[in-house]
Amino acid sequence: MQAALNAEKCYIFSDVDGVYSSDPNQIKISKKLNEISFDEMQEISDAGAKVLHNRCIQLGKKFDLDIFAKSTFSDNKGTKITQQIESSEVKNIVKNDNLIQVFMKKKSVISDDEFLKVYRFLLDNNIITELYRKSINKKTIQFVIKKAEQNKVQELLEKKFKDFYVSQKNFVKLAIIGYGITQDNEILKKVISILKKYDIKVQDINLNQMKIEIILNRISNDVVNEIHKSLIK
């Protein structure tokens, strides 16, 4: 609508007064951001934070239209989402623990046909998966689902694939977001040091230009709080 009206600004009102450096309900030292880029905002949304709808961010970037996230209940300035990237620093930390990793194990090697059959079955039952893959020994299929669907998925798979042993375990994504942060090795070193201090094992690390994503099986808000304090001043 903003683009169609050729408006200069778009204001989106909600029950929070802008975009924060982390979830203020979980991390009490979270800080409101004055400005953030569309690309960084997209990464925050993709990481699981429910701040702005993906489509809203995509349209803002496409039409080069600044978006202001503000509170319905106050006159505070809010957060400006724009094309411009101010600086290379950590802007946001997202903990997504609403996930479960599913393992489907078989005594014999899983054929390519079986691998695809399981995937099609999940699609047919409207189960959205991430990281769908086969283990190196080709005897386990593993993937990630939303925690809300864990009982449904367990029941469906056990009923359909009786020659597989189905198990689950906790799966947590910790995303550290900010343009160019992967060029600063000290950021990841600090995070790994804090995780090691609390004996939290890292399962995987994924990097792109704007995000460090660390896969864990657990992490408390207190630990995230310490990471936040270390990275965001």
Name each model-derived stretch:
Residues 1-233:
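C-terminal catalytic "cap/lid" subdomain
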